[in-house]
Structures are given as C-alpha cells and as structure tokens.
Amino acid sequence: MIVHYFPLIFLLRAVYRRSEDGMVVLAALLAYISFHVGIMFFTPTNLPTEVYTSVLGISANASLLVTKNSGILVPFHTGLIGALVVLYFTRSSAQSLKKRTPYSVFSFVDKNVSVVFRSIILSLLAGILLTFIWPMFINFFLNIFTFISKDLNNPINLFIYGIVNRLLSILNFSHWMNQLFWFSNLGGSWVDPVGAVHTGDVGMWTAQLARNISGFTSGKLISPLYILNIFAVPAFILAAFQTYTDKLVHKRLIPFVILAVSMSILFGTLLPIEIFLVFTAPLLFTFHLFFTAILYAVLPMLGVTLGYSFTGNVLVGTPGSIIDLLVLIRNPIYQKALVILLFIGLMTFLLYYAVTSYYYRRGAISIINPNEKEICFKES
C-alpha cells in the first residue's frame, strides 16, 4: 500500500519541506483530491483496465450522473506525474499569494484560504486537461509493450523491457506493466499437459512450478530481480555506508544498515533505493538502469530463468527475494541455474560496491558528507 500511495506521500512531504505550513499541506491534499475528481468525470473509458485506480476511494456511480458512461467511474492512475502537477500548482499558488498587496481585488480573503481554493481550482482544471493528453501517453507505452512482447526471447527486447520497467517503476507505473506481462498474453502463454492455457510470465511460472516442470518458457522477467535485491542493493547500501567518516554517525547508522540490507534480501527494497538514486545520484542511477537492462538480456542466454510463484495483486507482489529462491534449492531442475545466478550475483555485488564507493568518494562526496571537504580544509 505504501507503493500505491507513494505519489501522495511524496507530494505532502515535498510541500511540507518547502513551506513547513500546515495550511499549504492541506491545500496540497485537497488539490490532489480535486485533481483526480476532475480526471474521474472526464476520463475516457476505452483505456486498458489496468490504468484505472481509485485514489483515496474516489469513485462515482455513473447511473446517478448525467453522462454517457455506465458503471462505476474511477480516475486513471497518474503516478508521480500527477503528484508533480499538483505540487507545481500548490507551490505557485502559495508563492504568488505571498506577493499579494493589501490593495488587490481579493485582499479581503485570508491568504491561507486563497491558497487552498486556488490550488483546488487549478488542480481540478489540470486534471480535466490531462484526460485529453493522457491517452496518448498510455498508447505510446502500449506500443512499446506490444513491440517487446513480439519476441521475449530476443535480448534486445528484454534489454528494452528492463529499461522501461525500471523507469515506469520510478514514476509509480510499474504495476500496470507488471500486470500485463505477468498475467496476460503480453508475457507469453503456455498450454499444460491437460490443455489449460496459462498466460503471463508469472502465471506460466506458477503453473509450471506446481507441476514440477522447468520454467524454460517463463521466469525471464523475474530472474534479474533476485540479483538486484539480494546482491546489488546490499552492495550499494554497504558501500554508501562506508563513505561516512564521522565515527559517531557511522556507529549510529549500523542498525539502519543491517535492517536495510535484511529487508532487501528478504523482501526486496529496490524501488526506494532507485528513488534515492534519482534524486541524489543520477549518474549512479543511470549505471544501475543500464546494468539492470543488461541482466534482463543476458540471464536467459545463460539459462537462468527463475521466476516468481504468485497469484495475487501486483501491488503487493515482492519478487526477487531470497525466500522465493530458497524454495528452489532442493529442486534438481533449477540447481544449475541457481549456481550461475549465485556467481553472477557475487560479481554484481563486487561491481556495485566498487562503482558506488568510487562515485561517492571521488565524484559525489558532498551528497553524503557535505562538510567533509570544509573540515579537511580547516584542519589543514
């Protein structure tokens, strides 16, 4: 659920950090709601069902309204983009009203109230406008998805999948892509011995694992996540931790580092790390993005196709954890793939540790230790 509400959390946090004013935060929350209300009433109904989601329970019965639509109306998912739109209008409203003079037309209206109403109205109009633009955004990515799905055995297609998947994850759209590739025909299909058809990479893997059949046709979209969660993320955390030079800070962060590494290995914490990299170390994120894409392209060629057995909502799915991997250890069908995965994982750990250490020590020391150069200068 944290992933689902991440855009709203990001919005409220960003507004509060800039203004530290409770009324501006309230304005952002109400503007976010009005933004999705505007989308709900004007949203097209011909988009894939995966792109629609009820934000904060926002929905309406179309039969009670004067509309051509039927059923329950819900807004389409806007992810982090929607939060950024509302953030812009909330901040601009707050800043413009700071410059308001006592002689303005609406000087009799309290400034805080003006911020709230202006943010709500502008966000509502932005939501309505977005309903005319958003279908082009959706169709653009649908064309990319269709291109990728035409040949999931092609390393180039898998390379593109890796890049698109991680970029959409940052924008809070990965659940849409995952739903299509995990459980629909875009991820492939497989007919079991009794004639039942199973679709999607995760759907096929779940069925094949239940029948003790090697997932030679599935698992390729999940395998890289094992390496990233179990090896890459812990390496990044440990390397970043080692760049702290203050012994007191170093000691205080040890419990957090242990917890973060454990969470990544047991449950997967790839997304929070990626978001951190986007805002603090874009170059390091670029390295991570292309290395992830390379893993998607190379692992199937090496025979490493270890999937994720799951049948629930993609929003709560946590693929790539060591718990899922331990289930496969005793199965002789997957032992060769596990050995290769372990070897590549160890190489990945060393690579991420080296790249992260070099980046923070030589290229971006100020991000983690902003006063380190200053201190060294004064001491000398």
What are the roles of these predicted feature ranges?
Residues G127-G195:
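Aromatic-rich transmembrane-lumenal/periplasmic boundary elements in polytopic membrane proteins
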Residues F6-R18, T78-K99, Q179, L221-L248, ...:
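Transmembrane alpha-helical segments in integral membrane proteins
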Residues N178-F181, G187-D192, G203-A232:
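Individual transmembrane alpha-helix segments
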Residues V194, V202-S214, P234-Q242, F256-A260, ...:
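Transmembrane alpha-helical segments and their short flanking loops
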Residues M1, V37-H77, S104, F108, ...:
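Inter-helical loop and helix-membrane interface segments of multi-pass membrane transporters/permeases
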Residues V3-H4, K111-V116, S149-I160, L209-I213, ...:
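Membrane-interfacial loop-to-helix junctions in multi-pass transporters
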Residues M1-P102, D110, F279-L302:
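Early transmembrane hairpin of solute transport permeases
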